[in-house]
């Protein structure tokens, strides 16, 4: 048990901390990008699909659905930009559905449905969920710090049956 804890202190915990801190940094960059490209109150900011800007939600949603019908299933296809993030269309063969990958510093996945306007709402909801994802990553960092402290304390504890082990080992020898 002691060696496992030492191994976790040296390898696992630092790697996990670095990963979560990278997530937090990426989320902060993406949140800054989104704040640089705000959405007007109860309105649609517009989306660029295949080089054409769409300011109307219905037209943008219909174009997005049309792209799903013609997109290849075997590789991702870059289709435009939304609020400073690149937009890539991908097919998830496991769930048999299309996904939008919104890429900034991090990748934000949106599962697409059959409703044109609903897909645009899903995109916005995914982007509004970034602070929640960042908070979860921060909670994970805090948890890892607690686990590191507990592991350090556990390593300093002597083996409780050390005397019994020594006595029985001596008898066997």
What are these regions (language model features)?
Residues 1-50:
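C-terminal accessory region of SF2 helicases/translocases
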Residues 34-79:
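Charged, long alpha-helical assembly modules
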